[in-house]
Amino acid sequence: MKGLRTPAARAVAAVLTEARNKAGLTQREFAARLRRPHSVIGMIESGQRQVTVPEFITLAKALGADPVELLHAVIRQT
């Protein structure tokens, strides 16, 4: 899982986790909004699974966050 060790991959996981917490959602609640198993959210947040750009946008919107602002947060962390 070489790509998951990159600073950018870690930043994506951290930013999405922070946004979920800010939204006041558990992993299960977030997953329910997306109609996905909660294990998918856990894998993303723990860095076991990368997300594509379209998926990042979907995740951000499901959290009520601006995808561009979240991407800027990722860039600031790298």
Residue ranges and their predicted role:
Residues 48-58:
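Short, basic-rich loop-to-helix N-cap that marks the start of a DNA-contacting helix
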Residues 1-22:
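A short, Lys/Arg-rich alpha-helix, primarily the initiator
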Residues 45, 55, 63:
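DNA major-groove recognition helix of helix-turn-helix
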Residues 20, 31, 60:
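The alpha-helix within a helix-turn-helix
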Residues 1-2, 61, 69-78:
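Short, charged recognition helix plus adjacent turn
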Residues 24-46:
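Short alpha-helical DNA-recognition segment
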Residues 17, 28, 57:
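Residues within the helices of the helix-turn-helix
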